[in-house]
């Protein structure tokens, strides 16, 4: 393409025409052009330094028109408002926000709104005399949470808020004693989020909070905050890390005193808190929540003392286990949340404990019993202000039906021979002879040995092989082809029953199963059985790290996972775990403390469960396991039962107790049923069903009693009874009359309809014996039974 240039652009071409335009620069040489260019640039630089002031408007004409225009333009601007006085802001800094109307953070009149505080109503005259900056507003729970709270949870949030804000008395602490599965975590998340965001004074009530829990639940708390708040708040979860990292992180949390903290909630375990209490106790904290708070029943331990040193007045204690009638422990719990509410320990003993205990004695006088009753009522009146308790009977409206069964399995011939030989040995005789009022360590070891033998002979094979005292000739009882590391279910009645039931479940359903034991050695046998039958499984015990526990639980609960078995140590994961991926649970051996068993068995029948649940408690017929079950069932006083593994066992067993434990009831279907002296059964056959108002929380005497597989609610157990021929007796009951569709807490429609349908409080009381002095407290119901 040809390009044409203008004449001025063609510098290298001589223009011959005289009439043509010639630029001035073309007539000069190169040096002259450069000088001309520098001259022009210098003039331009000088011109930029000159500031020319605008000339005033001048009118040269003298006409009236020009004068009128000049007068208008010279006049100053005036705001066209009558009597307007301009305010030039001489006393006000630039950028100050104008005062705004004080209002609640959320609409108190919205549908399903949960209002925790309602300000007093003022007349217009009273409002004019009040300072507008001090008018109180409504405190309304975030609709994100109020729309998923069930009626009993709304009541619990309101109760805790009134306690921590001092609305129920001159105290700021409370005990949330709801049973497992009622959503204590969600209620605490709601309370914490509300206090961090608002108050009646239009500002946050607290700036920081600490949640202290067992180490296995720290990650679970973080997940719950994220789940319910949808990531609107970040928590500081202390999981692992070096000492230097932990110290630096906690110091940063402690030094942050701003009202809008980036991570306002610290999630920490009891052990970590105790180690770093010197850092956390330096700063003020808005509120502390203690999960599994029954750990604080001993006021002398270091963890209790460390938490008491925390600078906070708002204390919330969570405990899913019933508060039992050890008055000293009970005082420790109440004194932690509300110091001085019951006075000092000496005052409490003088004012309440001594009088109540004297009234319980069999030889107490009428005056002492009357005084004990008065003191009990006085104590009830005090503690009911700060304790709320509801039973899991409330869950029957939201969860599928739960079938609970106590299965008595016969010992095999091998187990029976070893068991009876040991009871007849000199070892047991010496244990009984050495026992006066306290149990010897030898007797405790013998008790553990018998419990392990009831599970499987493999668990005591080392004693058999070493021919220890009591087992001198027992190794000869084992089969000739016996191999200790190769599981043989036929050597144990409970394992044989478990093997049959797992096979039937695997073949006939897509159900998942949780296996729980108090011994990790039993978990080893579970693993051997799973590998032998080619079942996929996961295992959680005390050796697993906290981070890995969360991954294992998530994998098992995943509906797409093919994991069939979840093996769990009750000591490591009996509290707080949510295993709703399974709907069948085997409690393979009983614990001395019924609360531990209840915690472990509550892992599957929880919020989010959509299938009917089957809970199996296996005990060896006539053995020491039935003795343990009887202690749980009859709920004897704490002087003759073991409450937890932190207490020494020897103070609980007398010589008569040991004689009962070291006895075996042969040729009985169930020693427990015999001792119940059941009037509804004749010759071990039930003639009359339980009352209609009973369920699986009732006493065993009010359950269904089966000496054969007819009438069992579970076809799997019925088939296994016939196939294994090792079941002798079954107690069973259900949670409610009929199964109902499961409803999760995110089902907003059901929550709305339920709240409209029922406006009254839903409270349930414990169905305890008179001699089991369990506190059954709620905001609307007093407990009784000291």
Swiss-Prot record:
Residues 497-654 form the Helicase C-terminal domain. SMART domains: DEXDc, HELICc. The keyword Nucleotide-binding applies. ATP binds at residues 178-185. Its EC number is 3.6.4.-. Residues 776-786 have a biased composition (Polar residues). Transmembrane segments: none annotated. GO terms for biological process: cell division; chromatin remodeling; DNA synthesis involved in double-strand break repair via homologous recombination; double-strand break repair via homologous recombination; double-strand break repair via synthesis-dependent strand annealing; meiotic DNA repair synthesis; oocyte fate determination; oogenesis. GO terms for cellular component: nucleus. One of its GO terms (molecular function) is DNA translocase activity. The keyword Protease does not apply. A motif (DEGH box) lies at residues 291-294. The modification Phosphothreonine is found at residue 22. It is found in: Nucleus. Residues 165-340 form the Helicase ATP-binding domain. Residues 2-9 are annotated as: Required for chromatin remodeling, strand pairing activities and coupling of ATPase activity. Its main location: nucleus. InterPro entries: Helicase_ATP-bd, Helicase_C-like, P-loop_NTPase, Rad54_N, SNF2-like_sf, SNF2/RAD54-like_C, SNF2_N, SNF2_RAD54_helicase_repair. Residues 738-786 are annotated as: Disordered. CDD domains: SF2_C_SNF. It is an enzyme of class 3 (hydrolase). Pfam families: Helicase_C, Rad54_N, SNF2-rel_dom. Interacts (via N-terminus) with spn-A/Rad51. Involved in mitotic DNA repair and meiotic recombination. Functions in the recombinational DNA repair pathway. Essential for interhomolog gene conversion (GC), but may have a less important role in intersister GC than spn-A/Rad51. In the presence of DNA, spn-A/Rad51 enhances the ATPase activity of okr/Rad54. Belongs to the SNF2/RAD54 helicase family. This is DNA repair and recombination protein RAD54-like. It comes from Drosophila grimshawi (Hawaiian fruit fly). The lineage of its organism: Eukaryota, Metazoa, Ecdysozoa, Arthropoda, Hexapoda.
């Amino acid at each position: 393409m040809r390009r044409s240039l203008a004449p001025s652009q063609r510098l290298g071409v001589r223009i011959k025409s005289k009439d043509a335009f010639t630029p001035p620069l073309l007539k000069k040489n190169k040096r002259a052009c450069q000088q001309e260019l520098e001259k022009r640039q210098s003039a331009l630089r000088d011109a930029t330094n000159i500031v020319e002031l605008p000339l005033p408007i001048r009118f040269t004409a003298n006409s009236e028109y020009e004068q009128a225009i000049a007068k208008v333009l010279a006049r100053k601007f005036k705001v066209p408002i009558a009597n307007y006085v301009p305010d030039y802001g001489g006393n006000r800094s630039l950028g100050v926000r104008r005062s705004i109307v004080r209002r609640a953070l959320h609409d108190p009149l919205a549908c399903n709104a949960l209002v925790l505080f309602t300000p007093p109503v003022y007349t217009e005259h009273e409002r004019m005399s009040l300072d507008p900056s001090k008018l109180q507003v409504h405190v309304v729970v975030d609709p994100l949470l109020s729309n998923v709270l069930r009626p009993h949870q709304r009541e619990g949030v309101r109760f805790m808020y009134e306690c921590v804000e001092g609305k129920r008395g001159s105290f700021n602490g409370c005990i949330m004693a709801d049973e497992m599965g009622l959503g204590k975590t969600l209620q605490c998340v709601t309370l914490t989020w509300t206090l961090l965001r608002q108050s009646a004074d239009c500002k946050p009530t607290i700036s920081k909070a600490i949640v202290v829990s067992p180490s296995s639940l720290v990650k679970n708390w973080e997940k719950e905050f994220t789940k319910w708040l949808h990531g609107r708040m970040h928590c500081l979860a202390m999981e692992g890390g070096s000492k230097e990292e932990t110290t630096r992180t906690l110091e940063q949390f402690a030094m942050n005193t701003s009202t809008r903290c980036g991570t306002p909630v610290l999630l920490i375990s009891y052990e970590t808190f105790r180690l770093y209490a010197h850092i956390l106790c330096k700063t003020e904290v808005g509120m502390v929540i203690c999960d599994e708070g029954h750990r604080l029943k001993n006021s002398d331990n270091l963890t209790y003392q460390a938490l008491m040193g925390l600078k906070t007045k708002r204390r919330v204690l969570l405990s899913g286990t019933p508060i039992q009638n050890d008055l000293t422990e009970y005082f420790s719990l109440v004194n932690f949340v509300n110091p001085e509410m019951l006075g000092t320990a000496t005052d409490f003993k003088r004012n309440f404990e001594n009088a109540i205990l004297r009234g319980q004695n069999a030889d107490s006088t009428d005056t002492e019993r009357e005084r004990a009753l008065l003191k009990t009522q006085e104590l009830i009146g005090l503690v009911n202000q700060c304790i709320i308790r509801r039973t899991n009977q409330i869950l029957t409206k939201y969860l599928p039906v739960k079938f609970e069964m106590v299965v008595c399995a016969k010992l095999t011939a091998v187990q029976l021979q070893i068991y009876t030989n040991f009871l007849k040995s000199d070892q047991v005789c010496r244990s009984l002879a050495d026992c006066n009022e306290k149990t010897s360590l030898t007797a405790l070891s013998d008790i553990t040995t018998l419990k392990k033998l009831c599970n499987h002979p493999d668990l005591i094979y080392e004693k058999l092989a070493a021919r220890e005292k009591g087992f001198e000739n027992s190794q000869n009882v084992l089969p000739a082809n016996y191999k200790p590391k190769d599981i043989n279910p036929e050597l144990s009645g409970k394992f044989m029953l478990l093997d049959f039931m797992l096979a039937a479940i695997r073949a006939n359903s897509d159900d998942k199963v949780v296996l729980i034991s108090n011994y990790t050695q039993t978990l080893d046998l579970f693993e051997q059985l799973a590998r032998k039958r080619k079942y996929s499984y996961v295992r959680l015990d005390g050796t697993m790290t906290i981070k890995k526990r969360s991954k294992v639980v998530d994998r098992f609960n995943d509906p797409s996972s093919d994991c069939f078995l979840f093996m769990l140590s009750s000591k490591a994961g009996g509290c707080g775990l949510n295993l709703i991926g399974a709907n069948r649970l085997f409690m393979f051996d009983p614990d001395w403390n019924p609360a531990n068993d209840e915690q472990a068995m509550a892992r599957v029948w929880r919020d989010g469960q959509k299938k009917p649940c089957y809970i199996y408690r296996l005990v060896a017929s006539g053995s020491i396991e039935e003795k343990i079950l009887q202690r749980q069932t009859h709920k004897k006083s704490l002087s003759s039962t073991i409450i937890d593994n932190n207490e020494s066992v020897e103070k609980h067993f007398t010589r008569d107790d040991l004689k009962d434990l070291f006895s075996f009831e042969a040729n009985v279907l169930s020693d427990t049923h015999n001792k119940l002296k059941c009037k509804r059964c004749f010759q071990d056959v039930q003639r009359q069903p339980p009352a209609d108002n009973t369920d699986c929380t009732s006493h065993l005497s009010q359950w269904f009693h089966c000496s054969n597989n007819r009438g069992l609610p579970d076809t799997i157990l019925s088939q296994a009874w016939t196939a294994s021929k090792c079941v002798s007796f079954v107690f069973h009951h259900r949670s409610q009359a009929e199964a109902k569709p499961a409803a999760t807490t995110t089902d907003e429609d059901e929550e709305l309809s339920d709240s409209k349908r029922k406006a009254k409080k839903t409270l349930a009381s414990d169905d305890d014996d008179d001699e089991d002095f369990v506190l059954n407290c709620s905001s609307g119901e007093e407990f009784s039974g000291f």
